[in-house]
Structures are given as C-alpha cells and as structure tokens.
C-alpha cells in the first residue's frame, strides 16, 4: 500500500512539474519538463538520501566516534527487525532528527547535536525509534524523493519568473501574469501534495516508535521539548530548503515564513494525546525496553573530536 501511495504522490508531483513547464514554454516546455521530471525521479531514487544528508552537513559516526548513540540505534533496529542503519549527526543547535533511504537495507538516521545535548537518553531513544518506524514503513523513500522533486518544482517556478515572462505567445501561452501565478501556486501545490500523506504517517511512526521502545511517554516528552525549541532555535539549513521540512520529526521552520501556514506535521498536542492514550492501552507493557545509554555531562562534542584534533569522549561516546 505504501508503494502505491508513493507512486501516486510522485505522479502528482510529476504532473505539477509538467504544468510549470507548460506555463513557461508551452507544449515544448511541458515535454522538456516531463523528461526532466522522469530523470529527477530516477536520480532521486538512488541519490536523494545522499543529497539531503549533504545538504545538512551530516557526518557519519560509528561505534568508535559515538559508541553510546550508535549502539542505542542499532539495538532499537534489532528490536524492530531492521538491519542497522547508518548513523549521522548534524552540527545544529535545534533539537531535531530525520530518517532517509530508499529501503531498510540502505537507510540512515540523522540527529542534531541540539537533540543529543538537550534530551534525556530515553527521549533520544524515543526519537530514534520514531525514525526507525518510518524506515520500516518505507516512508523514507517517499519523504526524501518528495523533498527533492518539490525543491525542483520551486526552482523551475523561479526560473519561469525570471525568464518565462513577456507577451503571450506560442512558447509562453499564459503570458507574464500566468507565469507569475504559476510561480506562486506551484510550490504551494507541491506542499499540499506532501501534506496529503505525511501527516498520517507521523501518527503511524509515533505509534510504531512507541511500540519499538516500549515507552510511549518518552517519545511524548521528546516531542514536547523539540516543539518548544524549534520555535526558539532557528535551523537555517531548513529555512533555506523548506521542501525538506516534512522529513523531520518536528517541523524545523521557525514559523516566521509563509511555509509554516501549510505545516506537513500534525499538531504536537494531538500527537502527545495519541501517545498518552497508547501508553494507557499498553499499561506499562509493550516491548521490554532495554537500558538507556548513560549520558555524560553536556557541553562536549558528540563526535568525540576536540578543536585541537585530539580524541575525547563527548556526551554520546
């Protein structure tokens, strides 16, 4: 079912991409846009995860550089019957995280330094379990490819604003006014297509993550903390690339932008209420939680590398 939803979502975005091409260059522009969209879909399938990780400056860590954090993620993956994903850390003060990858065999999870330094070990485990649930449901393929294609739609629309104006002619059937309208509406439409699926998937990942960890309220507590900080601590990379906002566990946009009017995430209060209800249903049961990793005093470098180049152990190993 998730593969069908992914196909429908990508078809919708491809059609939108072609519509922008038609607005800019008529039938010729539409055909070029179709070729570009098809190539983008193919390229995104194989490379979108690498692009997003590079976009956020994520660094891969292992059991040498961040042993506690990596072992925790691998233990959660074992409980979820998933192969261990690659683990990345982003040098960003905003507490947040996302997962990416075309399938569980090629998946990765990424957390910010802000998340590792401001949340308790149980809360971090709840966040990582949520991301692993996305991987298990194959949400990461849809989220990452959607981010790439939606970004391409915005770029094409901006191109149309710069070069697609002028008088109405065969190459530009809508003229300057039509092109401007398309520039405004196309990115918004792309965001609406993203919203069609991503909100329900967040609830499913919350539930799946809570079941993996066995502690729904650990995730609920993490959501409350991350949500509060996301409005106070800016994520400049996300502000520059709002098409990737739906990938994060909490919307990373500050709220000062128009993008936030079309949030890809359900209200945090509703997510917490659903987790609280799940906790009552589980009655303290669910999967038996493993021991949370010991956290060291805050202020260290989660990568375990000091400015002088020597190795030292940070709060996550």
Swiss-Prot record:
Transmembrane intervals: 6-26, 28-48, 145-165, 173-193
Gly residues composition-biased segments: 306-317
Bias kind Pro residues: ranges: 290-300
Places the protein is found: Cell inner membrane
Entry GO terms, CC: plasma membrane
InterPro entries hit by this protein: HtpX_protease, Pept_M48_protease_HtpX, Peptidase_M48
Topological relation to the membrane, as annotated: Multi-pass membrane protein
Name of this protein: Protease HtpX homolog
Species this protein is from: Xanthobacter autotrophicus (strain ATCC BAA-1158 / Py2)
Gene: htpX
């Amino acid at each position: 079912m998730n593969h069908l939803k992914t196909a429908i979502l990508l078809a919708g975005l491809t059609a939108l991409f072609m519509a922008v091409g038609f607005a800019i260059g008529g039938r010729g522009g539409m055909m070029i846009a179709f070729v570009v969209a098809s190539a983008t879909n193919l390229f995104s399938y194989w490379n979108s995860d690498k692009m997003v990780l590079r976009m956020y400056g994520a660094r891969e860590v292992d059991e040498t550089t961040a042993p506690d954090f990596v072992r925790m993620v691998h233990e959660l993956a074992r409980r979820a019957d998933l192969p261990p994903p690659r683990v990345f850390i982003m040098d960003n003060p905003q507490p947040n995280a996302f997962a990416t990858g075309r399938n569980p065999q090629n998946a990765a999870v990424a957390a910010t330094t802000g998340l590792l330094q401001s949340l308790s070990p149980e809360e971090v485990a709840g966040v990582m379990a949520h991301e692993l649930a996305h991987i298990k449901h194959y949400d990461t393929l849809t989220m990452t490819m959607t981010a790439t294609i939606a970004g391409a739609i915005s770029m094409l629309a901006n191109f149309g604003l710069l070069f697609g104006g002028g008088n109405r002619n065969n190459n530009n059937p809508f003229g300057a006014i039509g092109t401007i309208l398309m520039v405004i509406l196309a990115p918004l439409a792309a965001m609406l297509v993203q919203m069609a699926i991503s909100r329900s998937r967040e609830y499913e990942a919350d539930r799946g993550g809570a079941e993996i960890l066995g502690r729904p309220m650990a995730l609920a507590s993490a959501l409350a903390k991350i949500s509060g900080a996301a409005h106070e601590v800016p994520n400049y990379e996300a502000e520059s690339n709002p098409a990737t906002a739906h990938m994060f566990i909490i919307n990373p946009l500050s709220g000062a932008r128009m993008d936030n009017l079309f949030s890809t995430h359900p209200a945090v209060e509703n997510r917490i209420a659903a987790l609280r209800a799940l906790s009552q249903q589980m009655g303290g049961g669910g999967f038996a939680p493993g021991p949370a990793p010991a956290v060291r005093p805050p202020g260290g470098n989660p990568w375990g590398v000091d400015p002088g180049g020597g190795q030292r152990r940070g709060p996550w190993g």
